[in-house]
């Protein structure tokens, strides 16, 4: 694997003792961010980049709660990344005990604010996010881990009837801007009050109708909300571009990233892929085709070198007319798909590559190096 200089995001995800830009003021950037404390490094931890998630699974096979059962399965694959819905710090405790290094969390991902973001709702939102963040920052069991707090596909909040020929209304757009900024302030206030924190907590907003804005000029989260908020990162639910040529995929990610105001202490590239993938049904219930097409999608998205690319998902959540749609790595009969095997082998290959790099260079790979390695590895795989 070639030696690529680690960029700032790689440093963030690997938890260095200090951010490269920490303590330095950038006069060209008007936005300010609370200084982040130094945190310890987890032994042998590196940004794995590729991962999966579990939301609303339609089945399970043990006495465990369905999401927890799936999280165990994801960990058994060798994954270091987990994306789930979070309700409270207490609910997260068994997940934090697992050997994941990065947690992408839907937290308070509801549409209550779309009905009018009243002072009382603002107060409740701020308090909940502040207390949740402070809990993560002060717990002993979160040491060395990174948490991203965000929400489900933001454009559906702005288009409640899912009519993509419409623009988002000014009222909903303004409410979303305020909602995201309240959440950001809560996280930054909590971060500033815990100088001894042993983990990282960031915010993200999720966009999902990017091409509407990019190609048709429609008002969407990406162009109407992102330029006016102060979120740390952006998640892109990439279904509207994942089947396009690789040049268009990269251009779309560039477009999303360009809408973000720069932030001191954070890298220039702050977009990750929060959802992608084709269902079993969309691939004709053919395991080999499902593996190949999704492997190609993952490799294509990795060419942009995002910090994460997350496949949707481990257990299927969609059932139509009694039939499983098949957004899965493990089906409703507890059969592991060929794609499950591919990702499990990828995670093992990443571990070996990281060990080799550490032995050779005395450092672990950064996110861009792992993204490049994973892209090449996936492209080199023979069809199953």
Question: Model-flagged regions — what are they?
Answer:
Residues 32-43, 47, 51, 56, ...:
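Aromatic-rich peripheral "rim/lid" segments of glycoside hydrolase catalytic domains that contact
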Residues 43-44, 71-76, 91-103, 136-143, ...:
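Acidic (Asp/Glu)-rich catalytic clusters
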Residues 50, 60-106, 309:
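Catalytic domains of carbohydrate-active enzymes, especially glycoside hydrolases
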Residues 60-75, 213-225, 290-300:
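Short, acidic/polar
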Residues 111-113, 158-163, 263-294, 311-330:
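Active-site clefts of carbohydrate-active enzymes
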Residues 136-170, 198-207:
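Active-site groove signature of glycoside hydrolases
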Residues 150-151, 177-218, 266-277, 308-314:
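Aromatic-lined carbohydrate-recognition surfaces of secreted/lumenal glycan-active proteins
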Residues 224, 228-284:
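Glycoside hydrolase catalytic-domain groove-lining segments
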């Amino acid at each position: 694997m070639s030696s690529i200089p680690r960029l700032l995001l790689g440093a963030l995800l690997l938890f260095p003792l200090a951010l490269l830009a920490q303590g330095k003021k950038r006069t060209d950037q008007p936005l300010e961010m609370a200084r982040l404390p130094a945190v310890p490094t987890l032994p042998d931890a590196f940004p794995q980049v590729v991962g999966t998630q579990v939301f609303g699974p339609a089945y399970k096979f043990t006495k465990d709660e369905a999401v927890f059962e799936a999280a165990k399965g994801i960990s058994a694959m060798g994954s270091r990344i987990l994306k789930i819905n979070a309700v409270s710090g207490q609910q997260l405790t068994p997940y934090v005990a697992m050997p994941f290094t990065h947690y992408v969390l839907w937290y308070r991902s509801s549409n209550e604010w779309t009905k009018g973001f009243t002072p009382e709702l603002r107060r409740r939102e701020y308090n909940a996010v502040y207390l949740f963040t402070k809990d993560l920052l002060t717990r002993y069991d979160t040491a060395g881990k990174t948490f991203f707090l965000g929400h489900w596909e933001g454009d559906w909040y702005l288009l409640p009837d899912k009519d993509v020929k419409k623009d988002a209304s000014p009222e909903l757009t303004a409410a979303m801007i305020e909602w995201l900024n309240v959440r950001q302030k809560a996280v930054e206030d909590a971060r500033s009050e815990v100088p001894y924190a042993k983990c990282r907590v960031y915010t993200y907003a999720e966009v999902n109708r990017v091409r509407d804005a990019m190609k048709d000029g429609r008002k969407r989260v990406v162009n109407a909300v992102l330029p006016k908020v102060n979120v740390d990162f952006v998640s892109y639910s990439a279904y509207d571009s994942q089947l396009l040529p690789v040049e268009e995929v990269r251009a779309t990610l560039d477009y999303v990233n360009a809408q973000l105001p720069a932030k001191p202490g954070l890298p220039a590239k702050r977009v990750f892929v929060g959802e992608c993938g084709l269902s079993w049904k969309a691939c004709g219930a053919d395991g080999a085709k499902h593996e190949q097409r999704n492997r190609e999608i993952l490799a294509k998205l990795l060419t942009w070198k995002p910090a994460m690319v997350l496949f949707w998902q481990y257990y299927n959540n969609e059932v139509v007319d009694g039939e499983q749609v098949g957004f899965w790595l493990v089906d409703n009969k507890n059969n592991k798909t060929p794609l499950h095997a591919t990702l499990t082998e990828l995670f093992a290959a990443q571990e070996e590559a990281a060990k080799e790099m550490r032995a050779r260079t005395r450092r672990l790979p950064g996110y861009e190096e792992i993204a490049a390695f994973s892209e090449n590895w996936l492209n080199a795989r023979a069809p199953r």
